[in-house]
């Protein structure tokens, strides 16, 4: 969910998407965290130098994570020092960090083997993983697709059920990789999928109550582009006006679509699209979830993002509105955060989306709660809080999976 508040393009036409297959080169780029009491000083630096931000503060003394290209480093250092801002280096060389992260391990047949969660993977291997997982558990799983992406890829997931039989229980829907560069969500959602059947006692207890629909990659075109051409790509790959590419799929859902938490600029990272629900990926997801709602109903929806370590409740479109069952949602979110912390000491902040991270209209969580009356819905921001940001080292995949699975189990214990 994390937005890029782009005040100027990082790589000219490459980041804006005007050259669809140009590979972005981030060697020599620094990612720097600034903080200070007067955030207007930071805004001035970002604006004057035309820099990209990974994260911008909601209040004074909050952190701002900024990407600085080589040719602007000297001026950035001069201006930040003159403004008296605190500085911390997140990535000394973003390109080197990306290269290390992209050491994809070859995939071996057989599902979640000992090496799967030790590295990130290409799109084709994720498809193989899901198919192998389903084959290994054919008696209570099936491959499902919600529809096709703009470029014609299937939006693939796995349906897992328990003793009641296929489709007999209320649905739980987990979405990963809505934003293409948030790779830790892909792996963590797959870790949850694996644990539903590997954690025999806890998994069986959940599957006897609910049918799970797990979609590790809901933005396949964007994800492929992020692995093959631009690691920092966020949106889908539709071509827009001005020759720019991509709609922000978490600003395109057809509920409270037209608001301050997105933009009409086709070149912006938070472009909401030309109309509510216009993106093929959004159409596919809304249609699929509506079908579940018309069946046994939707018990829970979680939209998994990174980064910032947050577990949030509705709403995103308004900072004053609250869901009808807000007290229950807050209790569940707190249970998630407490259980996560007990595993590796990772702290998550909880609260409504708008007041916790930023205003976001046209998002999936609000749509699920108000349009199809899903009982519970949450938006998560996984590891970390900014030391690595979107480029999270592979050695954090398993810890992220372990703590998130603990949080999921705890959250369900509060669900009646």
Curated annotation (Swiss-Prot):
Report the EC number(s), separated by commas if there are several: 3.4.17.-
Provide the residue ranges of the propeptide in this protein. 18-113
What residues does the Peptidase M14 domain cover? 119-415
User: GO biological process annotations for this chain's record?
Assistant: proteolysis
Cofactor note from UniProt?
Binds 1 zinc ion per subunit.
Q: Where in the sequence is the signal peptide annotated?
A: 1-17
Q: Which GO terms describe its cellular component?
A: extracellular region
Say if the entry is tagged with keyword Protease.
yes
**Molecular functions per Gene Ontology:** metallocarboxypeptidase activity; zinc ion binding
Positions bound to substrate: 179-182, 234, 250-251, 306-307
UniProt xrefs under CDD domains: M14_CP_A-B_like (cd03860)
Keywords in alphabetical order, please. Carboxypeptidase, Disulfide bond, Hydrolase, Metal-binding, Metalloprotease, Protease, Secreted, Signal, Virulence, Zinc, Zymogen
One Pfam entry name = Peptidase_M14
Task: Summarize where Zn(2+) binds, as residue positions.
Answer: 179, 182, 305
Q: List the disulfide bonds.
A: 244-267
Swiss-Prot/TrEMBL cofactor(s): Zn(2+)
Give the function comment from the record.
Extracellular metalloprotease that contributes to pathogenicity.
Homology family = Belongs to the peptidase M14 family.
What is this protein called in UniProt? Metallocarboxypeptidase A-like protein MCYG_01475
| Record organism | Arthroderma otae (strain ATCC MYA-4605 / CBS 113480)
